[in-house]
Amino acid sequence: MKTVIFAGGLGTRLSEETELKPKPMVEIGGKPILWHIMKLYSYYGFNDFVICCGYKSYVIKDFFYHYYMHSADITIDLKKNDIEYHSATSEPWKVTLADTGLNTQTGGRLKRIQKYIGNEPFMLTYGDGVSNVDIPALLEYHYRHGKLATMTAVLPSGKFGALEISGDNKIDSFCEKPQGDGNWVNGGCMVLQPEVFDYIPDSDYDSCIFERAPLENLAKDGQLQAYKHTGFWKPMDTLRDKTELNEMWNNGSAPWKVWK
């Protein structure tokens, strides 16, 4: 089964980082967040990826084209124009890098890579957040309910600490990062049947936002199910998010690192 990853956005709230690279290439622990996302799927045996590139797509293509070199010590013989690799580590991944346009919306990006999916079910997620979603459990749930689409639903944490204050203004408890307002939100990690492509227009699809009409119509037709994930999930939307994720990684307490 293929895993599609949206990786074409501009990442305007991370402008200090994304002037030179696309948002999915912003690093956590010295590796792009895209790599961390792929490692989760790979841990569960899913190694066939389709990356929907857009903004500065050449950065993503260069990373994977030279992946073997990035992960090894090398000896370069300039006279012979020869490179010797030492103790290189690689991944069992097959990666299709598709340029889906600079300003294309998510529905258009998905429609543009339909030719790489064929008539098979596939998974879809975003290239700017990490989680510890149990992928086999997600798939089992998807096939059990039999609908066309499953979306992982998450409860995002609040941005600020929460205080419980008694009548005399005494603080009875303090919670550093409680859950947000109690509303479930789209956490990515979707499983989709190929019929989902029928919900995206066949023409003028570049302006189609997948999270609008396609998903809304799937919901109206009773074909969209939620897989509730109460474990770790965190998007990297701001420099603060990037700092927090790097601190988790550097402290050896990254909940999304399920691999060894």
What kind of feature is each model-predicted range?
Residues 1, 47, 119-121, 222-223:
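Short coil/turn segments at beta-strand junctions that form active-site/ligand-binding loops
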Residues 1-62, 66, 97:
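N-terminal glycine-rich phosphate-binding loop and ensuing alpha1 helix
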Residues 3-5, 51, 124, 149-152, ...:
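Structural beta-sheet core signal
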Residues 36, 108-112, 214:
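Well-ordered alpha-helical segments embedded in enzymatic catalytic cores
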Residues 59-167:
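Conserved beta-loop-beta/alpha segment of the NTase-like Rossmann-fold superfamily
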Residues 121-123, 130, 135-143, 155-158, ...:
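Catalytic-core segments of class I nucleotidyltransferases/pyrophosphorylases
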